[in-house]
From Swiss-Prot:
It holds the Pfam family Ribosomal_S8. HAMAP family: Ribosomal_uS8_B (MF_01302_B). Disulfide bonds: none annotated. The gene is rpsH. One of the primary rRNA binding proteins, it binds directly to 16S rRNA central domain where it helps coordinate assembly of the platform of the 30S subunit. Belongs to the universal ribosomal protein uS8 family. Coiled coil: none annotated. Gene3D superfamilies: 3.30.1370.30, 3.30.1490.10. This is Small ribosomal subunit protein uS8. GO terms for cellular component: ribonucleoprotein complex; ribosome. The keyword Flavoprotein does not apply. GO terms for molecular function: rRNA binding; structural constituent of ribosome. One of its GO terms (biological process) is translation.
Length: 132
């Protein structure tokens, strides 16, 4: 099975599972997807994730996070840079998501990181997605 936008597929699976109040979601694995999952975990948007080495590609099980009244930790997650239109931003143009209430995930020359970290290290890069 081939996807035009594997990162967009991962984000859509997370959004749909979160809106349906599922406990877990399974996505095909890649190094970039694992790094995005690490950032989401470190920022408190997901509980945890586990990488499975099943088959040639493997998979990632993402455990979603909810508040006490079953409200999802992820209100929305949007893909910004797409295969048909890549969006690169310099350091001074990195957006602030909801005035700091959300995060922007960037792929930089120093790895995948959140907007706050990219500003601190003074690096720009490809704006993968925004989460709040």
């Amino acid at each position: 099975m081939s996807f035009t936008d594997p990162i967009g597929d991962m984000l859509t699976r997370i959004r749909n599972a979160s809106n349906a109040r599922h406990e877990k979601v399974l996505v095909p694995a890649s190094r970039l997807k694992v790094r995005i999952a690490e950032v989401l975990r470190d920022e408190g948007f997901i509980k945890d994730f586990v990488r499975h080495e099943d088959g040639p590609q493997g998979a990632i099980t993402i455990v979603l996070k909810y508040s006490g009244d079953r409200e999802p930790a992820i209100s929305d997650i949007k893909r910004v840079s797409k295969p048909g239109l890549r969006r690169y931003v310099p350091t001074d143009s990195i957006p602030r998501v909801l005035n700091g209430m959300g995060i922007a995930i960037l792929s930089t020359s120093k790895g995948v990181m959140v907007d706050r970290e990219a500003r601190k290290q003074k690096v720009g890069g490809e704006l993968i997605c925004t989460v709040w």
